[in-house]
């Protein structure tokens, strides 16, 4: 068994330890200059056989130092931490990480670092560094002028300062001429074929507003019932409409028949009619902002119910229900961001050059997602880490009495750069599903179709991971990164198939390097989506018949342990099949001779699509300073690959559980991670990580809620 020692960025000399406190070994103080997590062998614990054959640290890609003889040790904070914490790390995380490109890049450095993302609410940075290519054309005259600086700034300002408002409305009436200006602005919107498909129904009647309020309330309740507990708690606090508090409500409709059957541009895309009306809404919203009027868009309606309640013609589509009124103030940030419900996605995530995936802001060279992500992975923040240890000492409990949970809460502080750290809630388990060509070798008793069938089960809510997620209040997010069969579109399924299953790695590489990188990107993008959607913890999950064979191969490559020692019985196989499975792994390793220094190459040769995606999730989570709770053997294999790509990604990892698969023990030892739960589980799907989630949340909550000796008036020892 091993224990994780959390070490910081730029640590300095350790403070003198107090009596009874765990003491950091001297080696750690010397060696922790770079690594985020330093695995430390725990000598008095049960010896684990694979430790004996572990590769010497010197040949590892990771800079982490293994301190073989140390006691169970917990590092002390550096005397004067070098890095400042970010006080509101939560709201800023997404935007902020983009501006820190100077971290470790293991392969080659990107040709050009991405430009920093403008702070939300700030003016955009000056224009592109290189001039856009000119289209050769006879120069006749100067192009039509844009606005002067002040006018342009006014236009940009109104866009920046437009807010969706639900709180702080005033009852002041809206003068007719003001409302008229706002409606005129809406009416100048662009529209498909100039069909101008909108109508505006201006509602002032208290009775109608009360009817609409009741309809919205019913939908709110119905929506709340669908939420995982972690989300439902947050949602309860949110205000989602101000129908009764605003003097004017405006219904914006779209007439899909307006302009007749030959409306230009609507021929193949009927949705252009409601899109046009949505543009009218944006115009209205901006004009209202310029008048000092707040607007709140309410979409908690059943459309047909609404059409009937308002007596609208049946052929109309309702595009928007808007609450309009004067307000006390316009918040700088979206109300959902302020409430911690969501985060702003940086512009650099969504601008592609020429083809999708070549991300680049104008004037930048396109950069690849993996390089950008790795560049943003930072060590734990020394100051927050130091504060966490200090706080643990002052909490009303004997020093060290929370054992491993103290280490977790310090890690969470260092990761988030704040102490106490945010409670990792809401959380989402990302279940990546993929099939494996090596299934053909008879390494499992289960038919391959079960992968797709289990995906349907996850989406239907009937699997063990659903039950555990329900219990702990987490969201289940299912990603098809490589299931062999075609899966029907289903709510909750992210269709991200890179290829329909890997090839049989006993006869050739499992996949190409490009496919491997694409699967890693799927994981990174999943991490980005889940974190931007407000999740504060990511859990790894996976489904893929035959994937323990793949995990064994990966673990063998990264740990150097013989396949015979780490290849387990997966879903339960007999001796004969087990012997074949070991032989299959052995043959694959002989065929490919994968080089652990080239982790992407290892994944391509003997990996799985879900393993590569989990690598991406770990790297993505680490780059967004969000904890990643690892599940079992496949997550362990992925974490080894992630560490080989970016050693500091381990700073975000928490081992949820120890699987019954022998390979998992080898992986955890190599990673230096101590599992929180040890129940002989061998299911996957994220089940072990889900069981561990409340422990991780408890570690953070204790930091928030446990009194200190001073505050509680308790005498110290
Ligand atoms: C199509 C659409 C529907 C929306 N529906 C709701 C809603 O029902 N309730 C709500 O509180 N906000 C709603 N909003 C507002 C968004 O939550 C808001 O635009 C987003 O959080 C960003 O904040 P900002 O508009 O202040 O920048 C809606 C916005 C749009 C564009």
Question: What do the predicted segments below correspond to?
Answer:
Residues 131-172:
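N-terminal targeting/leader regions
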Residues 1-146:
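Long, low-complexity intrinsically disordered regions
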Residues 196-277:
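Glycine/small-residue-rich phosphate/adenosyl-binding loop
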Residues 321-377:
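C-terminal helix-cap and adjacent tail motif
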Residues 369-717:
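N-terminal loops that bind phosphate or other acidic moieties
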Residues 43, 93, 101-103, 118, ...:
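N-terminal amphipathic, basic-rich helices that act as targeting or association modules
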Residues 182-187, 250, 258-309, 460-476, ...:
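Small-aliphatic-rich amphipathic alpha-helix that forms the alpha element of a beta-alpha
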Residues 220-228, 240, 311-338, 512, ...:
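A glycine-rich helix N-cap at a beta->alpha junction
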């Amino acid at each position: 068994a091993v224990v994780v020692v959390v070490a910081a960025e730029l640590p300095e000399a350790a403070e003198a330890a107090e009596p009874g406190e765990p003491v950091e070994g001297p080696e750690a103080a010397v060696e922790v200059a770079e690594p985020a997590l330093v695995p430390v062998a725990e000598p008095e614990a049960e010896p684990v056989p694979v430790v004996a054959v572990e590769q010497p640290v010197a040949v590892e890609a990771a800079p982490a130092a293994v301190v073989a003889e140390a006691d169970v040790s917990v590092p002390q904070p550096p005397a004067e931490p070098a890095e400042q914490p970010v006080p509101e790390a939560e709201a800023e995380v997404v935007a902020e990480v983009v501006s820190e490109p100077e971290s470790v890049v293991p392969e080659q450095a990107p040709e050009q670092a991405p430009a920093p993302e403008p702070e939300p609410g700030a003016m955009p940075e000056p224009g592109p560094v290189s001039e856009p290519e000119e289209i050769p054309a006879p120069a006749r005259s100067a192009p039509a002028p844009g606005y002067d600086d002040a006018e342009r700034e006014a236009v940009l300002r109104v866009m920046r300062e437009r807010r969706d408002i639900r709180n702080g409305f005033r009852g002041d009436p809206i003068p007719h001429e003001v409302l008229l200006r706002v409606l005129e602005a809406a009416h100048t919107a662009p529209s498909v074929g100039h069909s101008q498909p909108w109508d505006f129904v201006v509602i002032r009647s208290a009775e109608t507003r009360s009817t609409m309020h009741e309809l919205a309330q019913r939908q709110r309740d119905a929506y709340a019932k669908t939420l995982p507990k972690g989300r439902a708690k947050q949602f309860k606090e949110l205000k989602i409409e101000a129908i009764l508090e605003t003097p004017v409500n405006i219904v914006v409709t779209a007439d899909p028949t307006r302009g007749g059957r030959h409306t230009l541009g609507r021929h193949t895309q009927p949705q252009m009619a409601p899109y046009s009306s949505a543009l009218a809404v944006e115009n209205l919203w901006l004009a209202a902002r310029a008048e000092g009027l707040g607007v709140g868009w309410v979409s908690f309606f059943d459309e047909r119910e609404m059409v009937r309640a308002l007596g609208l013609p049946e052929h109309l589509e309702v595009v928007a229900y808007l609450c309009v009124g004067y307000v006390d103030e316009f918040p700088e940030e979206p109300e959902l961001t302020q409430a911690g419900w969501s985060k702003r996605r940086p512009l650099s995530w969504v601008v592609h050059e020429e083809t999708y995936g070549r991300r680049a802001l104008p004037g930048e060279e396109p950069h690849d997602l993996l390089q950008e992500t790795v560049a943003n992975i930072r060590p734990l923040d020394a100051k927050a880490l130091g504060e966490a240890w200090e706080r643990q000492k002052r909490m009303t409990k004997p020093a060290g009495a929370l054992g491993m949970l103290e280490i977790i809460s310090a890690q969470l502080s260092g990761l988030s750069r704040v102490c106490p750290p945010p409670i990792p809630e809401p959380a989402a388990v990302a279940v990546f599903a993929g099939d494996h060509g090596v299934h053909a070798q008879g390494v499992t008793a289960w038919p391959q179709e079960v992968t797709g069938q289990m995906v349907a089960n996850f989406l239907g809510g009937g699997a063990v991971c659903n039950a555990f997620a329900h219990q702990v209040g987490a969201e289940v997010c299912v990603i098809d990164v490589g299931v062999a069969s075609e899966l029907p579109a289903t709510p909750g399924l992210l269709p991200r198939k890179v290829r329909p299953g890997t090839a049989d790695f006993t006869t050739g590489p499992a996949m190409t390097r490009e496919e491997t990188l694409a699967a890693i990107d799927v994981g990174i993008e999943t991490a980005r989506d889940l974190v931007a959607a407000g999740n504060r913890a990511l859990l790894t999950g996976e489904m893929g018949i035959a994937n323990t064979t793949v995990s064994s191969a990966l673990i063998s490559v990264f740990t150097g342990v013989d396949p015979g020692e780490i290849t387990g019985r997966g879903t339960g196989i007999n001796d004969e099949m087990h012997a074949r499975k070991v032989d299959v792994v052995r043959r694959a390793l002989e065929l490919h001779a994968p080089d652990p220094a080239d982790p992407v190459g290892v994944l391509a040769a003997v990996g799985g699509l879900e393993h590569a995606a989990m690598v991406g999730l770990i790297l993505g989570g680490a780059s967004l300073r969000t904890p990643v709770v690892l599940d079992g053997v496949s997550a362990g294999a992925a974490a080894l690959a992630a560490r080989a790509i970016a050693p500091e990604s381990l700073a975000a990892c928490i081992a949820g559980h120890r699987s019954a698969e022998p390979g998992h023990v080898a992986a955890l030892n190599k990673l230096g991670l101590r599992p929180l739960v040890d129940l002989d589980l061998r299911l996957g799907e994220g089940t072990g990580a889900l069981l561990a989630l409340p422990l991780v949340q408890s570690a953070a909550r204790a930091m928030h809620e446990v009194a200190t000796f001073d505050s509680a008036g308790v005498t110290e020892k």
